[in-house]
Amino acid sequence: MDYSYDEDLDELCPVCGDKVSGYHYGLLTCESCKGFFKRTVQNNKHYTCTESQSCKIDKTQRKRCPFCRFQKCLTVGMRLEAVRADRMRGGRNKFGPMYKRDRALKQQKKAQIRANGFKLETGPPMGVPPPPPPPPDYMLPPSLHAPEPKALVSGPPSGPLGDFGAPSLPMAVPGPHGPLAGYLYPAFSNRTIKSEYPEPYASPPQQPGPPYSYPEPFSGGPNVPELILQLLQLEPEEDQVRARIVGCLQEPAKSRSDQPAPFSLLCRMADQTFISIVDWARRCMVFKELEVADQMTLLQNCWSELLVLDHIYRQVQYGKEDSILLVTGQEVELSTVAVQAGSLLHSLVLRAQELVLQLHALQLDRQEFVCLKFLILFSLDVKFLNNHSLVKDAQEKANAALLDYTLCHYPHCGDKFQQLLLCLVEVRALSMQAKEYLYHKHLGNEMPRNNLLIEMLQAKQT
């Protein structure tokens, strides 16, 4: 179903730059790109590019390379699931609430332009509170600066995190329910790890170590959608997650003097971070209403994206361009990664840093982060769900909540909602590259034994 568009507010098609004709398949596009996208999806067309898959797509050249045009349609946010498979006129009305909110806002802006006689670019609408300042660069106190980056690679760190060792995870051969079964429901004997936080507000056992504070979580305020408020309450504190992971990594070091290889240590950090993410999902509204099979299907689809987003948001808060902050609190300079981690991992880290800069410029806040996390979990791209309608409803509500929040709190940046969704496209691309890297390491027998991430990769392929 297409929605009308007010031509007074000039906007150009994000695919080719032609004049926008309305809302088509998830966003504002021109009539030509609407028809092209619809025909491509309904006819299941497969294109090839005779160049380097980077052809310029504009109004005059949009028909020269259908491959690059279709890829750009997907990149800017046109949705495959919005196209009807029965070839009837009109798309699937999945985005109606979002369209209506966006259209109402544009009507309001148009009225304000006429009343005040100025362009939108000169400032936020009258009566709207000024946007919050960009998040400050997060700096560790001098006493908490982690050991020199080389310590992570060449030997045990000298700081409070110096007793790292490979955690002894109770990993047995995956049973018929896959590697996630024991995390979601401990009744399955192949996994013995249970929820670290069985109640929404329960704290994990505190491990010894210095305090590690991040900005206080947002506790509420005017015009914050209820869904986002609920997600903020479910989001674990960073210092609690750090303390639990550090404790898990230190535990086996008490009984062994040798130190694990740096890459093995990073894999175990990722394992423990993912366990925290699974725990968050288990307590998440809607998710806990799904059958176990659907829960595992969703997590197997998005586990790598959730890990990437977790890392990205930590760097946005950290605020440094020449180093990264690990979940354990250690700082690692990018120059160290370049020298000792290999070219593949270095290129992956640099690509992630580009997204960090982009999100920092967009002033990504905690409210938007928890909403993006929820959107990744409830992806509409997942097939073979028993309760697809519940997942679809969760996705639509999260989209609407994020749109409402960005329009209300960042009125000076009218396309922030769309920009955030485009960042999710890059998160997915990064996650694909990360999985390829892990599988490359696995084929070279460089992955630690009983690694949960490799089990997730293998479960996805079976």
From Swiss-Prot:
**Biased-composition ranges for Pro residues?**
126-139
A Pfam family that the UniProt record links to this protein: Hormone_recep
Q: How is it modified after translation?
A: Acetylation stimulates the transcriptional activity. Sumoylation reduces CDK7-mediated phosphorylation on Ser-203.
Mark the residues carrying the PTM N6-acetyllysine: K34, K38, K72
Q: Where is this cross-link: Glycyl lysine isopeptide (Lys-Gly) (interchain with G-Cter in SUMO)?
A: K119, K194
Task: Give the matching CDD domains.
Answer: NR_DBD_Lrh-1_like, NR_LBD_SF-1
What is the protein name given in its UniProt record? Steroidogenic factor 1
> Species name for this entry?
Mus musculus (Mouse)
- Per the record, the gene is Nr5a1
